[in-house]
Curated annotation (Swiss-Prot):
It is found in: Cytoplasm. Pathway: Purine metabolism; IMP biosynthesis via de novo pathway; 5-amino-1-(5-phospho-D-ribosyl)imidazole from N(2)-formyl-N(1)-(5-phospho-D-ribosyl)glycinamide: step 2/2. Keywords: ATP-binding, Cytoplasm, Ligase, Nucleotide-binding, Purine biosynthesis. The lineage of its organism: Bacteria, Pseudomonadati, Pseudomonadota, Gammaproteobacteria, Pseudomonadales. Its main location: cytoplasm. It catalyses: 2-formamido-N(1)-(5-O-phospho-beta-D-ribosyl)acetamidine + ATP = 5-amino-1-(5-phospho-beta-D-ribosyl)imidazole + ADP + phosphate + H(+). GO terms for molecular function: ATP binding; phosphoribosylamine-glycine ligase activity; phosphoribosylformylglycinamidine cyclo-ligase activity. InterPro entries: PurM-like_C_dom, PurM-like_C_sf, PurM-like_N, PurM-like_N_sf, PurM_cligase. Belongs to the AIR synthase family. The keyword RNA-binding does not apply. Its EC number is 6.3.3.1. It comes from Pseudomonas putida (strain ATCC 47054 / DSM 6125 / CFBP 8728 / NCIMB 11950 / KT2440). This is Phosphoribosylformylglycinamidine cyclo-ligase. GO terms for cellular component: cytosol.
Length: 352
């Protein structure tokens, strides 16, 4: 008989009991997000969801995303309560731009060693994001992978499926010269540009935990959860029918994201002087000596969503958005793109 000790999964660094404890902790979170179309609870091999009633030609829309290196900042600060909302926002905001209503969401949480408290905090944030978006958290995967991640470090990915009526898909094809562009404010950098942000903080030797801007801790400004625009935008679409295109301003800023929803011959003319850039962006620009054009190519600079409507629909759209609790403003207009011209022209860029 071998004298070698009997090895278990736990000896290899995987704690099945911890995984089961996490599932029990998060069942209530998932239940709070339940939509009537979702069939069954957590724990099955697959999650089932009916198409909501009332759709004539339903088209499913899917998306997946992560939160980039904002996660590294969350880990360094031991702040895990809002990163889940970031994850949901990055997915559902991408879905809503084509007019889709998010139906359900799944998450993937991978870690070297599962900390049940941290994971439960993250998933609670995911649940809060799902509630804000009106979609169900129907399942996910928690992978404890010793040797793949350092200690209790973790990575996140999100997956979302939504539905839109085929005849009501918003694809930018109706955008025309003279149309107006309306902006919705971001809460901060959202979930993009954090590799640059972290480099700026490192090179400038900023004491992030003891720095305040306008009386607010820099950590709070940088970790502010990504805004979820789903409900105000779906209300705008339903009540006005005015929306021709929408762009979620993520990595690539205004310069790279607006062209994704424009016809080839259209140019977005954006007046950078039309809004007061939040102080956190000016702080980052100054500390990193970042070129103004680079700021708009990497960061959202205070704009989280851009909406295109006809000029005669501007007031109705602004009023509808304000009624939904938003603070919209007209950020620019659509012009005809000259041959070879960029699809976004930024006017009134400040000299730096």
């Amino acid at each position: 008989m071998s004298k070698q000790p009997s090895l278990s999964y736990k000896d290899a660094g995987v704690d099945i009991d911890a995984g089961e404890a996490l599932v029990e902790r998060i069942k209530g979170v998932a239940k709070r997000t339940a939509r009537p179309e979702v069939m069954g609870g957590l724990g099955g091999f697959g999650a089932l969801c009916e198409i909501p009633a009332g759709y004539k030609q339903p088209v499913l829309v899917s998306g997946t995303d992560g939160v980039g290196t904002k996660l590294r900042l969350a880990l360094n600060l031991n702040k895990h309560d809002s990163i889940g909302q970031d994850l949901v926002a990055m997915c559902v905001n991408d879905l809503v731009v084509c007019g889709a209503e998010p139906l359900f969401f799944l998450d993937y949480y991978a870690t070297g060693k599962l900390n049940v408290d941290v994971a439960a905090t993250v998933v609670t944030g995911i649940g809060a994001g799902c509630e804000l978006a009106g979609c169900s958290l129907v399942g996910g995967e928690t992978a404890e992978m010793p040797g793949m991640y350092e200690g209790e470090d973790y990575d996140l990915a999100g997956f979302c499926v939504g539905v839109v009526e085929k005849a009501e898909i918003i694809d930018g094809s109706k955008v025309a010269t003279g149309d107006a562009l309306i902006a919705l404010p971001s809460s901060g950098p959202h979930s993009n540009g954090y590799s640059l942000i972290r480099k700026i903080l490192e090179v400038s030797a900023t004491d992030i935990e003891n720095t305040q801007l306008d009386g607010k801790p820099l950590t709070d400004l940088l970790m502010a959860p990504t805004r979820i625009y789903v409900k105000p935008l779906l209300q705008l679409i339903k009540n006005t029918g005015a929306v021709k295109a929408m762009a979620h301003i993520t990595g690539g800023g205004l310069l790279d994201n607006i062209p994704r929803v424009l016809p080839k011959n259209a140019q977005a003319v954006v007046d950078v002087a039309s809004w007061q850039r939040p102080a956190v962006f000016d702080f980052l620009q100054e500390k990193g000596n970042v070129d103004e054009h680079e700021m708009h190519r990497v960061l959202n600079c205070g704009v989280g969503m851009v909406i295109c409507v006809a000029q005669d629909q501007v007031e109705a759209a602004l009023n509808e958005l304000r009624a939904a609790g938003e603070q919209p403003w007209v950020i620019g207009h659509i012009a005809e793109a000259a041959e070879g011209a960029a699809q976004v022209e930024l006017q009134n860029l400040k000299a730096h």
